[in-house]
Swiss-Prot record:
Matches recorded under SUPFAM superfamilies: EF-G C-terminal domain-like (SSF54980), P-loop containing nucleoside triphosphate hydrolases (SSF52540), Ribosomal protein S5 domain 2-like (SSF54211), Translation proteins (SSF50447)
Protein known as: Elongation factor G
Species per Swiss-Prot/TrEMBL record: Caldanaerobacter subterraneus subsp. tengcongensis (strain DSM 15242 / JCM 11007 / NBRC 100824 / MB4)
Sequence similarity: Belongs to the TRAFAC class translation factor GTPase superfamily. Classic translation factor GTPase family. EF-G/EF-2 subfamily.
Classification via InterPro entries: EFG_II, EFG_III, EFG_III/V, EFG_IV, EFG_V, EFG_V-like, EFTu-like_2, G_TR_CS
Domain of life: Bacteria
GO cellular component: cytoplasm
Length: 690
């Protein structure tokens, strides 16, 4: 099968937003108008095409990023649906990594909310060009121009309106296109009958003012337009489109459109903007990677003739076909049934079938090309963030780094018989979601699940019940404490058994030192002259990592440590992987005790929005929770307090905040960093654990 669309006609986009800005409804409408769904799905009836996991339909929030392909005016658009709830920011990171452009959806009433800021900053990190869509123009309190100001002030972006609304709230009936300088009025409920007419008289002055602003903004990013603008010459529609496209792709401006997805108004012009201003894979620089030995930097151009390279960005357990691996192709082509190298794991994989996904129906295709997003069946060893590539031209694309879980609960099946079923289900879910971990507590023998927040774990328990028929009892949430060291040490680890029969001999010297916060574990091999043979080095590394699972203070995992293997010895006959693994483990535990270990706790970034009169109480309460207030500002009549608070102090905060503010306060929180627990509190935690 030859390529169906040339690469410049492909758009890989994500739709990002705060939890209630209307993102799923917007995606739904896009699928409706591009002819992919034949009945409109409503989120509050629980049938939206993208929200295909049952819990999402119940909660009305989008959790897993489903990838969907649709077509508009000769272009192929691959949409990655991203969740808007803070517990799922990892899903957002994961999808931003493989997008070329994004649509940021804002509610015309609330404007820029905390989660929209978080997602916006993540998109900045990956330099994702975007357009803004101001949705819900039909709701009471809608204010298009206020949202534009907020995008400028709160996000530090350069928003450029290319439309202005006609009417607002219940009189919202269309838009003024500032490029063509004409009005588009919607005539029917489905938004398929539109009148392109003259701009209403009362709106002409405003339209002229915003057309001027549009021309000024594009003159800033395009010199030829600047000259024409200063000379007072006519600037053509084509020139405006080209300058907006250039400015958007370079990240110099953000075109802003408006509408009401729920009322079916403004969606087709949004689709036009996606095609006109967001980049194709050709508009972006070649993707960078490393050679497998990490020695040289390589790149792959977006071209079908380059060697194949792709990134697996999502693994899903599918009830019909087993494990689905969603991947984005950066270069080359791939046929179903062929072999690829998973360069992250160093394993060959056979691509069974390749599926192009529509929210809940799938089409089997026999090949994928540069710029495509598809799902593969049959990959055994591939997990999220792995690189797939041509085995004759290996490359390692930059992987994604996922935050460690910050909250854990003990979980047990309601019947003993379901224990094994639960274990299998949990390992499947952990494979799908890199921020979800499951393990057995060594001391109590309980199964522990850990994730990014209470909602995250609730949804996991829910999926156990629905998808795997496992009913569970869940314990009280626990904070994921960690341990680390505070001073450098040099230690020896010996494991020698030589009494009769085959002996064991492993002997290592390690140098351990604290690593910067957030660095995790860094292992360095400094062995010279073969005092320990090369084949035993990975075993030492594995032994250290095993010992790191249980620290010496309270058995918590150890993080942020740099370990160098500097010396040791071996025995021709008795040395084995096992012996060196145990020696590495012994040395690490010994070193841990000597290196002044401390307890670390997760610190959350908390943002509380409250009416002015409750501010004193709320700040006092945050201080009592060991919080550090970082800053305050006023946002649409309410006060916003930003603080860093230990997670341990935040359990039950939702209820406390409601009662302190008579239900008028709201808050969001997400993990920010780990820091040392104050001595007196660390003592309490550790004595409770004993």
């Amino acid at each position: 099968m030859p390529r169906d669309f040339s690469l410049d006609k492909v758009r890989n986009i994500g739709i990002m937003a705060h939890i209630d800005a209307g993102k799923t409804t917007t995606t739904e409408r896009i699928l409706f108008y591009t002819g992919k769904t034949h009945k409109l799905g409503e989120v509050h009836e629980g049938t939206a095409t993208m929200d295909w996991m049952v819990q999402e339909q119940e909660r009305g929030i989008t959790i897993t990023s489903a990838a969907t392909t649709c077509y508009w005016k000769g272009h192929k658009i691959n949409i990655i649906d991203t969740p808007g709830h803070v517990d799922f920011t990892v899903e957002v990171e994961r999808s931003l990594r493989i997008l070329d452009g994004a649509v940021a959806v804002f509610s015309a009433k609330e404007g820029v909310e905390p989660q929209s800021e978080t997602v916006w900053r993540q998109a900045d990190k990956y330099h994702v060009p975007r357009i803004a869509y101001v949705n819900k123009m039909d709701v009471i309190g809608a204010d298009f121009f206020n949202v534009i100001d907020m995008i400028r002030e709160r996000l530090g972006a350069n928003p450029v309106a290319i439309q202005i609304p006609i009417g607002k709230e219940d009189t919202f009936r269309g838009i003024v296109d500032l490029i063509k300088m004409e009005a588009i009025i919607y005539k029917d409920d489905l938004g398929t009958v539109m009148d392109e007419t003259e701009i209403p008289e009362d709106l002409k002055p405003l339209a002229e003012e915003y057309r001027e602003k549009l021309l000024e903004a594009i003159a800033e990013v395009d010199e030829t337009i600047m000259e024409k603008y200063l000379e007072g010459e006519e600037i053509t529609e084509e020139e405006i489109h080209a300058a907006l496209r250039k400015g958007t792709i370079n990240g110099e401006l953000v075109p802003v459109v408006c509408g009401s997805s729920y009322k079916n108004k403004g969606v087709q012009p949004l689709l036009d903007a996606i095609v006109n201003y967001l980049p194709s894979p050709l508009d972006l620089p070649p993707v960078k990677g490393m050679s497998i030995d990490g020695g040289e930097e390589l790149e792959r151009k977006p071209d079908d003739n380059e060697p194949f390279s792709a990134l697996a960005f999502k693994i899903m357990a599918d009830p019909y076909v087993g494990k689905l691996a969603f991947f984005r192709v950066y270069s080359g082509t791939l046929k179903a049934g062929s072999y690829v190298l998973n360069s992250t794991k160093g394993k060959k994989e056979r691509i069974g079938r390749i599926l192009r996904m529509h929210a809940n129906h799938r089409e089997e295709i026999d090949a994928v090309y540069t710029g495509d997003i598809a799902a593969a069946v049959g990959l055994k060893d591939t997990t999220t963030g792995d690189t797939l590539c041509d085995e004759n031209h290996p490359i390692l694309l930059e992987s994604m780094d996922f935050p460690e879980p910050v909250i854990s609960v003990a979980i047990e099946p309601k019947t003993k018989a379901a224990q094994e079923k639960m274990s299998i289900a949990l390992s499947k879910l952990a494979e799908e979601d890199p921020t979800f971990k499951t393990y057995t507590d060594q001391e109590t023998g309980q199964t522990i699940i850990a994730g990014m927040g209470e909602l995250h774990l609730e949804i996991i328990v829910d999926r156990l019940r629905r998808e795997f028929n496992v009913e569970c009892n869940v314990g009280k949430p626990q904070v994921a404490y960690k341990e680390t060291i505070t001073k450098p040490v040099r230690v020896e680890g010996k494991f020698i058994r030589q009494s009769g029969g085959r002996g064991q001999y492993g002997h290592v010297w390690l140098e351990m030192e604290p690593a910067p916060r957030g660095e995790g574990y860094i292992f360095e091999n400094r062995i010279v002259g073969g005092v320990i043979p090369k084949e035993f080095i990975p075993a030492v590394d594995a032994g250290i990592q095993e010992a790191m699972q249980n620290g010496v203070l309270g058995g918590y995992p150890v993080i942020d440590v740099k370990v160098a293997l500097v010396d040791g010895s071996y025995h021709e006959v008795d040395s084995s992987d096992m012996a060196f693994k145990i020696a590495g483990s012994i040395a690490f535990r010994e070193g841990m005790k000597k290196a002044d270990p401390v307890l670390l706790e997760p610190i959350m970034k908390v943002e509380v929005v409250v009416p002015e009169e409750y501010m004193g109480d709320v700040i006092g309460d945050l201080n009592a929770r060991r919080g550090k207030v970082e800053g305050m500002e006023t946002r649409s009549g309410a006060r916003v307090i930003r603080a860093f608070v230990p997670l341990a102090e935040m359990f039950g905060y939702a209820t406390d905040l409601r009662s302190k503010t008579q239900g008028r306060g709201t808050y969001t929180m997400q993990f920010h960093h780990y820091e040392e627990v104050p001595k007196n509190i660390a003592e309490q935690i550790l004595s409770a654990k004993k």
